[in-house]
Regions:
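A short, internal acetyl-CoA/4′-phosphopantetheine-binding micro-motif in the GNAT/acyltransferase core
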Residues: 104-112, 138
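Conserved GNAT acetyl-CoA-binding A-motif
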Residues: 19, 127-140
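Conserved acetyl-CoA pyrophosphate-binding loop and the N-cap/start of the following alpha-helix
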Residues: 110, 114-122
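Conserved active-site alpha-helix within GNAT-family acetyltransferase domains
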Residues: 1-17, 117, 138-158
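Amide-forming acyltransferase catalytic core, primarily the GNAT-like/NAT-type
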Residues: 11-93
């Protein structure tokens, strides 16, 4: 919304970061998922279990999606982990009601091996929503942008993280 952006800027707000958000109907995402099983198992985790995995990210999550926000959300969010030989190789935090993916990240050494696809597949099975949404992805994030595009999850819009210096 260009008009709203101009109003915020006229009030002294500055853009810190630009974020993309992606959406797709759940069934269309399923059609893009491989039936070839990855060499990982998907397990339920607690939000604290992903503290050691923050290095998996290619960008720092927005304040709405950071670990503190995830902890505050409590049971409204589900955290799944992908384990390869008992080692956490990736994780996904999402809302089963809304279909919003708050965070999805894979250790760079395990990328392109089906880990994120396995997490996405399990998330889709657990969500009640007919829509999958990935929100607040810093622009650009080539690895996540390409992964989502390969699964048919389309860019739906852009948002800004803004700050007002007092």
């Amino acid at each position: 919304n260009k008009r709203a952006l101009k109003i915020y800027e006229s009030l002294g707000f500055e853009i810190l970061r630009e974020f993309n958000f992606f959406t797709q109907k759940k069934q269309l995402v399923v059609n893009h998922l491989s039936d070839k099983p990855a060499k990982c198992s998907i397990v339920a985790l607690k939000s604290e279990d992903i503290l050691s995995a923050q290095s998996f990210h290619d960008f720092t999550p927005s304040w709405q999606n950071d670990i503190e926000s995830i902890k505050r959300a409590g049971d409204d969010l589900v955290t799944l982990g992908a384990m390869v030989d008992s080692v956490l190789s990736g994780y996904c935090v999402f809302s089963p009601k809304s279909g919003d993916i708050t965070q999805i990240a894979v250790d760079p050494t395990f990328r392109r091996k089906g880990v994120a696809s396995s997490l996405l597949k399990q998330m889709i099975e657990m969500t009640e929503s007919e829509i999958v949404k990935v929100i607040n992805v810093e622009s650009p994030t080539p690895s996540l942008d390409a992964f989502l595009a390969s699964k048919g999850v389309c860019l739906a819009g852009k948002q800004f993280e803004m700050v007002l210096t007092l």
